[in-house]
Amino acid sequence: QEQIARSLGEGHRVIRGVAGSGKTLILAFRAEYLARAATRPVLILCYANGIAGRLEDAMQNRGVEDRVQVLTFHSWCYRMLRTYGIPAPSPREYPDYAERLAASVSEVVKAVDQGHIPMAQYDAALIDEAHDFEPQWLALAARMVNPRTKALMVVYDDIQAIYKGRERPVWSQ
């Protein structure tokens, strides 16, 4: 997996594999490889807290935790809002948790569109569990990648998708 991660070349990459095929391990090795050469942070986004925690541990074990940010997508959205002084949707406004999460994503997209949150903050963005991401989330993550590096990596397995009813991304976009 480490050799594959180093030999992926430049630009955007989409990796599809079945459960247990080593997708997350390849992603971790790739993040380390990119982080060692990066001038800006590397971002890893996941859907679930458990995988985010394991990837965060992996980055610490590899000594690149100061160059790699590992977050769930929604935690990253809240961090962006907090970092740039934009009020996050509150439980009072959105008592339903899922609606509050969706509103946080909308606020980040709006803030990026309006220039309140800068694009291209990361030399690379790597997305694990992309089968559980909505197309809008992937598009937002892609906007955060430095256009010079074009280093967006997405790993997925449609069979593992938690939310089967979600709109599926068109990977060529």
Give each language-model segment a name.
Residues Q3-R6, H12-Y84, A124-Q173:
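Conserved helicase motor core of SF1/SF2 NTP-dependent helicases
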